[in-house]
């Protein structure tokens, strides 16, 4: 801590000091609340709502409301909010992030701002990381809110739309971040207002906020449909890649480059684990060309083969079974790198999942097409107010401030932390490290001290499990393969003699309580088998011990062969230690090592922040477009009269077509009326334009607008009830907009991938994406206008026009919560195919305009 901080205190200390007077006021009301009967305490809710209606603010009633919740908690679940929990509750209401250590009762803290903000009647969402915690917290903490007369709902993956709608209409709703995000996207795909499930996004309290807003923010939420592409190409590429040999690429120094030294690639391809890239060598390119009978792999028509070969190489060289994914029930299931959990229903995008399926010889499913997508950053920024809780957020404060506009306030613990955090033990090889870990576990087990071992991969947990079996140490393994038993395994992890191996304990959400007699043995011992890429995840593992003033200890074991050191450590330092003739099993102790580990972690954290920021920069462009489309859809769903919008579309089209054919400086004798009729009449069936009575271009435009309006009025008069044509307008706008928007999302996806591959010289790819995306969006809105007008101008009264979904939803990338599939009603016509109307023109120049 610097001298300046010592004198005036840290940011957190100053902010905590500011809320102390509010907390003192809450505590002073406790005797008064204790005197109230249950009925009188419950009556406070109606009193608070009346005070809000009388123009008091939430801040005005906060002290009394928090005192009411504290008393209700004592009477319902037998828990009284500690002073530090009241501090946390005030900070959450202010829309900030509160960092509270594991075991400090964050779940109970959330009841304070949830109750207060629910009094406005606009809904409060409490966001958790999995269904188990959402259900547990809704049942447990929900007792407090229901006692006080508020309604509590929970959103679970298995629920149908009616159940979801009912839960969202409650005062307080518990749900996972994935469910909230996907429900938002699905709400913007429905075709009737009655199908909407969510209300407006008012206030979110995010538990494990760093996990939700940072770890998971590297991948956007995606709802997908089938693209119709064949899967045979993936199997062919897999057969080819199995015949290719992995090579190495010599790293060239600056002098080598100056001397034009050849990098001497070997093998058919080179994989770089650090950068997560894989490339064919010259030799490899020739083999691919021979395999597919190609003259030149680089030709544009071979782009799909290039792409699929690259995916297959990535699947074999960079994606590892039991680390990145598992195979279960003839399916490839992704493993969350941060929590070690299997993520059912989630699939890698862009064909990578299919490449892995081919590699593992399971059924290759058809590639998907993106129908709707949003990042967590943009989704959570839609809330009027948001806040978060976690045990570890300070290391990412910059990101919370820059992207979400939230600062982090560290709340002191209720009792002093007694956990001892030992220095890391570093070994030369992985084998020596594992032997040392086993000896440490055996020693602790013999004296009865419970041990929790945190591993990064499933492989590592199973390897360690085998070593413990050989030594006869009874233990339990908790990883992605067995997470059904999760809560039961964790509940026993603090008992005397318990040994538990867990893949990435981060975000498990279940406290480990110490068994009888464990305190005297030193509490729970945490052993980390290697350092994670993120310091925050390491701190979360440490935080499993020493909860609520309990004793405990933590220690990390590292080898120079660990991925972190191998890929991101200083090469010179690694070579120096490797060259030392150290006896087998001896620990390496050097202050430079600790600095190297910290530097490596900071390097990765900075890199991951860059990935998330880059994702957000691209999605910000999509978000601007998404807001426009979703706002237009909502107008239609709300039953707005779309007549004025249609008339405006007709007027714009008339102007566009006249301007396309007739220049401002042309006189009537120069007008190309034949061309004007050819493009105008198929859209708006006016009489052939002769130019009679029009002395100027503006006069011609005005006459055509008036004739088009008369035509539309005549069309409207064909329907017995005006509401019939109004509903048809809504149906057509929805159908055309959805169809074009989904194609546009896919096109934007392709554009982004293309921009990543192109070299724009000194031009920023994000700027290029924005410029080209803007042009594509304008083209899309133009095609929506043309198709809508054309359909409405040609609609007949005997036609049965109903709202329908335009694409089949096949799944999402984060879970399997998509609703029942929606069937496409008609076969999609290729833009270049002959138009089915029989005009002889291509579809895109005729009915597909």
Task: List the model feature ranges, each with a label.
Residues 1-581, 630-631, 647-648, 652:
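Conserved P-loop NTPase motor core
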Residues 110, 437, 820-822, 830:
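Active-site-adjacent structural elements in folded domains
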Residues 254-257, 471, 824-828, 846:
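Intrinsically disordered, compositionally biased charged tails
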Residues 325-333, 339-346, 548-549, 556, ...:
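Extended, charged helical/alpha-beta scaffold domains that provide interaction surfaces
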Residues 448-461, 638-639, 691-694, 836:
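Short, Lys/Glu-rich amphipathic helical modules
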Residues 453, 501, 741, 777, ...:
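Hydrophobic, well-ordered secondary-structure elements that form the walls
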Residues 825-844, 848:
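Short Cys/His-rich zinc-binding micro-motifs
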């Amino acid at each position: 801590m610097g001298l300046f901080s010592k004198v005036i205190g840290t940011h957190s200390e100053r902010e905590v000091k500011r809320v102390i007077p509010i907390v003192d006021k809450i505590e002073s009301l406790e005797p008064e609340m204790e005197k109230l009967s249950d009925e009188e305490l419950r009556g406070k809710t109606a009193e608070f709502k009346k005070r809000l209606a009388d123009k008091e603010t939430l801040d005005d009633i906060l002290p009394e409301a928090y005192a009411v919740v504290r008393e209700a908690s004592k009477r319902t679940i037998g828990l009284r909010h500690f002073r530090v929990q009241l501090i946390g509750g005030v900070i959450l209401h202010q829309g900030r992030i509160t960092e509270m250590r594991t075991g400090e009762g964050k779940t109970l803290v959330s009841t304070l701002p949830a109750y207060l903000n629910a009094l406005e009647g606009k809904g409060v969402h409490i966001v958790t990381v999995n269904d188990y915690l959402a259900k547990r917290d809704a049942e447990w903490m929900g007792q407090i809110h229901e006692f006080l007369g508020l309604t509590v709902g929970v959103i679970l993956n298995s629920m149908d739309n009616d159940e979801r709608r009912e839960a969202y209409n409650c005062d307080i709703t518990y749900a996972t971040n994935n469910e909230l995000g996907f429900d938002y996207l699905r709400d913007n795909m429905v075709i009737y207002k009655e199908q909407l499930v969510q209300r407006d996004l008012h206030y979110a309290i995010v538990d494990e906020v760093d996990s939700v807003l940072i770890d998971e923010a590297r991948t956007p939420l995606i709802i997908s449909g089938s693209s119709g592409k064949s899967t045979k190409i993936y199997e062919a590429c897999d057969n080819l890649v199995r015949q290719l040999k992995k090579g190495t690429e010599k790293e060239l120094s600056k002098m080598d480059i100056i001397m034009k030294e050849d990098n001497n690639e070997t093998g058919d391809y080179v994989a770089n684990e650090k950068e997560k890239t894989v490339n064919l060598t010259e030799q490899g390119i020739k083999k691919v060309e021979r395999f597919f009978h190609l003259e030149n792999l680089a030709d544009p028509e071979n782009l799909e083969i290039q792409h699929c070969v690259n995916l297959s190489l990535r699947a074999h060289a960079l994606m590892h079974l039991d680390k990145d994914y598992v195979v279960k029930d003839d399916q490839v299931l992704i493993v969350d790198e941060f929590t070690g959990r299997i993520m059912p229903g989630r699939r890698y995008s862009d064909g990578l999942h299919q490449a892995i399926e081919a590699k593992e010889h399971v059924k290759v499913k058809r590639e998907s097409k993106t129908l709707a997508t949003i990042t967590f950053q943009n989704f959570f920024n839609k809330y009027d107010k948001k806040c978060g809780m976690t045990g570890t957020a300070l290391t990412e404060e910059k990101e919370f401030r820059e992207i979400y506009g939230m600062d982090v306030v560290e709340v002191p613990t209720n009792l002093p932390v007694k956990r001892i955090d030992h220095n890391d033990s570093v070994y030369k090889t992985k084998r020596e490290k594992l032997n040392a870990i086993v000896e440490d576990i055996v020693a602790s087990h013999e004296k009865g001290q419970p041990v929790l071992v945190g591993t990064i991969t499933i492989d590592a947990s199973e390897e360690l499990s085998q070593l413990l079996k050989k030594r006869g140490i009874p233990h339990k393994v908790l990883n992605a393969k067995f997470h059904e038993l999760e809560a039961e395994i964790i509940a026993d992890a603090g008992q005397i003699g318990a040994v538990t191996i867990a893949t990435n304990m981060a975000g498990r959400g279940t406290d480990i309580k110490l068994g009888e007699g464990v305190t005297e043995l030193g509490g729970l011992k945490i052993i980390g088998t290697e350092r994670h890429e993120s310091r925050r995840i390491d701190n979360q593992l440490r935080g499993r011990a020493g909860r609520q003033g309990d004793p405990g200890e933590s220690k990390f074991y590292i080898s120079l062969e660990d991925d972190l050191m191998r890929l991101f450590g200083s090469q010179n330092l690694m070579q120096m230690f490797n060259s030392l003739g150290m006896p087998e099993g001896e620990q390496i102790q050097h202050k430079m090592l600790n600095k190297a580990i910290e530097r490596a972690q900071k390097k990765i954290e900075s890199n991951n922040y860059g990935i998330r920021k880059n994702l957000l920069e691209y999605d910000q462009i999509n978000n601007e477009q998404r807001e426009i489309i979703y706002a237009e859809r909502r107008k239609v769903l709300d039953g707005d009269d779309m007549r004025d919008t249609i008339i405006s579309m007709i007027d714009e089209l008339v102007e566009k077509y006249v301007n396309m054919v007739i220049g401002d400086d042309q006189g009537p004798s120069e007008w190309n009326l034949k061309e004007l009729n050819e493009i105008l009449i198929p859209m708006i069936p006016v009489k052939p334009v002769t130019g009679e009575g029009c002395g100027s271009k503006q006069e011609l435009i005005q006459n055509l607008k008036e004739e088009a309006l008369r035509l539309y009025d005549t069309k409207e008069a064909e329907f017995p009830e005006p509401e019939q044509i109004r509903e048809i307008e809504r149906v057509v706008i929805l159908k055309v907009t959805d169809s074009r928007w989904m194609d546009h999302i896919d096109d934007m996806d392709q554009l982004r991938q293309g921009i990543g591959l192109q070299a724009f010289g000194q031009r920023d790819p994000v700027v290029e994406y924005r410029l080209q995306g803007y042009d594509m969006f304008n083209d899309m809105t133009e095609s929506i206008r043309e198709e809508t007008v054309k359909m409405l101008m040609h609609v007949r009264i005997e036609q049965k026009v109903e709202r329908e979904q335009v694409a089949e939803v096949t799944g999402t990338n984060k879970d399997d919560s998509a609703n029942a599939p929606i069937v496409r009603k008609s076969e999609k016509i290729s833009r270049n195919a002959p138009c089915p109307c029989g005009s002889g023109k291509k579809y895109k120049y005729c009915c597909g305009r």
